[in-house]
Amino acid sequence: MTAPSTPKPQRKKPKTATTAKPVVPRKEATLHPRNRHTGRYDFQALIKTTPELAQFVIINPYGKESIDFASPDAVRVFNRALLKSFYGIQHWDIPADYLCPPVPGRADYVHFLADLLASVNDGKIPRGSIVKVLDIGMGANCVYPLIGYMEYRWNFLGSEVDPIAVAAAKAIVQSNDLSKVIQLRQQTNPKQILLSLLEPGERFDLTMCNPPFHASMDEATKGSERKWRALGKADPKRKLPVLNFGGQSAELWCEGGEARFVTQLIAESAHFAHKVLWFSTLVSKASNLPAIETALKKAGVLESQVVEMSQGQKQSRFVAWTFQTKNEQQIWRQRWVRD
């Protein structure tokens, strides 16, 4: 994706606006307490719901049941079993070579976003179809909308530039009879993220995004090689097969990498300052945070924060920002109140 510069819309700050909070990572967090995936997996229970998983179960070097996470087929079937067992998703599959994200980490992002909404709603998580979420670049897997709906009954709009990914996600949504609560939309301009996508009158309580994190295909390939070698070190007997962690080019890299993509997203978000309560995006590289902080200030963001997450040995985080004052946030939350 080529990320052109985006003109900042002319907008006056409200008199009650406060200076944007600097983006400073919080202390490391553990798996979210509402995450269903704490502790070890009961593989025999998973096999009962998804029998095809049995062929991929192995005994790891520690004598425990696991799967070969270096096998795309094993990871895909494992994800299918998790989504079926924990979330009631009866039908889930993706085309070969498309990104197959780890479900626990994706669930963490959803739960922490729920906490973000609760923070402006007297600690109560708003639930149901009144909450609208935009998943930017949902991919073929459609995992965020599936988890978000099953956990909180939120309604989703998923956007994607790849027509094959849109078709795959549509098949998942339709086969699980979720078309009324999960809508899909193709972004026809690959050089834009929010612009040319949203329609007049649309409002969202949240946006979420798993951005491309590499700046080139070469960088993405080297990243895959590092993952393979890390897995090889965990099992000295492992032979390094053909690189294939899954992921199409639009999922893995874009011109300028993660920093360029996120800063463009921030710039474009200013055009929808009062159409969205909280914008957010994952940030895989902590080294990109200073550039992101600069972009937030330039865009006129009034409040921002970094939420650190931890899944096993992996550390991740997301950045969230809003253009709305505290008073405007309180007005916004009134739409969540049901009669």
UniProtKB/Swiss-Prot annotation:
Q: Does the keyword Ubl conjugation apply?
A: no
Pfam families xref list: Methyltransf_10
Q: Annotated Gene Ontology MF terms?
A: 23S rRNA (adenine(1618)-N(6))-methyltransferase activity
Top class in the EC scheme: transferase
Q: Does Protein transport count among this protein's keywords? A: no
What is this enzyme's EC?
2.1.1.181
Q: Where is this region: Disordered?
A: 1-26
* Reaction catalysis annotation: adenosine(1618) in 23S rRNA + S-adenosyl-L-methionine = N(6)-methyladenosine(1618) in 23S rRNA + S-adenosyl-L-homocysteine + H(+)
Per the record, its GO cellular-component terms are: cytoplasm
Q: Sorted alphabetically, which InterPro entries does this protein's record hold? A: METTL16/RlmF (IPR010286), rRNA_lsu_MeTfrase_F (IPR016909), SAM-dependent_MTases_sf (IPR029063)
What GO terms describe the biological role, i.e. biological process, of this protein? rRNA base methylation
Output the Gene3D superfamilies linked to this UniProt entry: Vaccinia Virus protein VP39
Q: Any idea where this protein resides?
A: Cytoplasm
Keyword field: Cytoplasm, Methyltransferase, rRNA processing, S-adenosyl-L-methionine, Transferase
What does the record give as the function of this protein? Answer: Specifically methylates the adenine in position 1618 of 23S rRNA.
* Family as reported in the entry's similarity comment: Belongs to the methyltransferase superfamily. METTL16/RlmF family.
UniProt-recorded name of the protein: Ribosomal RNA large subunit methyltransferase F
This protein's species is Pseudomonas fluorescens (strain SBW25)
